[in-house]
Amino acid sequence: MPSEMILRLLDEMARYKLNRFHWHLVDGGGWRFPSEKYPLLTKKAAYRMEKDWDTFWQKDRKFVDEQTPGAYGGYYTKDEIRRVISHATKLGITVIPEIELPGHSNELFFAYPELSCKGKWTFDASDVCIGKESTFRFFEDILDEVIQLFPSKYIHIGGDEAAMNHWGSCTDCQRRMKEEGLKDNHELQSYMIKRIERYLLSKGRKLLGWDEILMGGLAPEATVMSWRGEEGGITAARAGHDVIMTPGSHVYLDFYQRESEGEPRANGGFTTLEKVYSYNPEPTALTPEEHKHILGAQANLWTEYVLDARHAEYMLFPRLLALSEVVWSPQATRSYSDFLARVNYHVPRLQERGINVYPLRRIAVDMQLDSTRREVSIHLSSERQPSEIRYTTDGTEPTATSQLYLGKPIVSADSILLVARLFDGAKPLDLPSVRYRTDYHKAIGKKVTYNGHTWNEKYPAGGTQALVDGLRGTPTYLDGKWQGFTTPLDVMIDLGEVTELKHVFARFMQERMQWVYMPGDVEVLLSEDGETFRSVGKQVTRTSEEEYKPVFETFSFPMKERARYIRLKAANARSAGHFIFTDEIVVW
């Protein structure tokens, strides 16, 4: 992001009492910190030809020289860094720099390949060689330059997502492990973190790292930034270490803030204003004494998919206002409805100051099932206040004469396509409508048996009934409605009695950059007794594994059959560790 944008951001941070700016200066997408001792970092690893992140990451991950015509990228000058620090200091904000190690170092090897295990740049190399002393000399030199510029007592060293895929075959790393008595790769990484910590302590600074630095043994005086949930932070606090909470589930602002249709590209997740506001940075699992180690919470905006400063502002505001209230107000005194009224007052003021703020345009759809009446009740609400919501149930776009939502649930026993839109009197707001398909189909509420494997524990959705609860997923797998699997899916639905069947279908998604792929094929089988099954069709996915943009595919099986048991099988398309996601098995 341009330094001018950072200066504007600092002004808004001060206005809303946010007092730490964590500056992620280097990563696999480019080196942005100016080094006098290692000038090739900015000459050879700060520019690339592909602006689009997916194209760059999937294509070749190669960089070009600084003066290459048409190249995308750049780096900060020392004067720009000094200006940012000076401005932040005047506003009472501390700037914390981050230099990534040992992972996220793809760009580093394009300038200094000798720091890799193989001694050359390769497509899959992202971790520095811990066995070479030259690696430590390099980072000590870089940290010296960082310390000269940044007065922060904390220096962030990353420590996250090391692939560890070359250390096992690297003679230097294996020699290091033998000499130091290290039993695995996690201890090898911990050796590096602890050694870097000793160096920082000798310079009067403290080490800060992502929660992976817990693995293999935590450095004695390290502070942990917990991003993979709260577990790492809880573990560190119980061990007497200071912690900053920043879980991806609640405070990753590179995620979509509403359903993705009509929104600029984001990083696949789903973090609404309400979700940010709901976060409690003090886990109930900790004692009052352990709570003292929770220094605060941090929101993160990763910019792989953020194209410019205006886009960055759109992702940050007004969700940063929710974070401010989270960290400054006791949870017992917080009220989302009260906050929503106030944040609607602040949005136009942010706009007056030139901030490209997200205009609070989400219509939330909450669906409840009545199994006795076999009906679906739909409740609508909006972030925007005051506002009018008009809707249709036949899939047509709402107009000024369409039904006005007055808070009473919309009830239906049929299959409907709800379309809702915000209005100002007779005028529709220049915001996209929301579409939501719902129906009370024959499998809703029926018994489901998972054969062999169940869902991945991180993505349970509604558990055993998730695939027959009538809840369709939104365009993000993190909305709590998509059930995720790292094993083949094999489920059986018991309809309770032999039933006439006309149609069975299930929808899957692909989000390649999040390791979510289509199943290789989907098969539907039927049975009267639950023992002997007959196949009524198998479909192979039409989606290429190479498609990296989000894709949704419905596997549809029309039929004229009678059966009590329906079995749906979906085969994984990729190797272990990759996901398939589905939201509902619909039966008519």
Regions found by a protein language model. Give the residues of each.
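Surface-exposed loop/edge segments in extracytoplasmic proteins
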Residues: 397-403, 531-538
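Short, compositionally stereotyped local motifs that mark structural "simplifiers"
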Residues: 330, 334, 340-490, 509
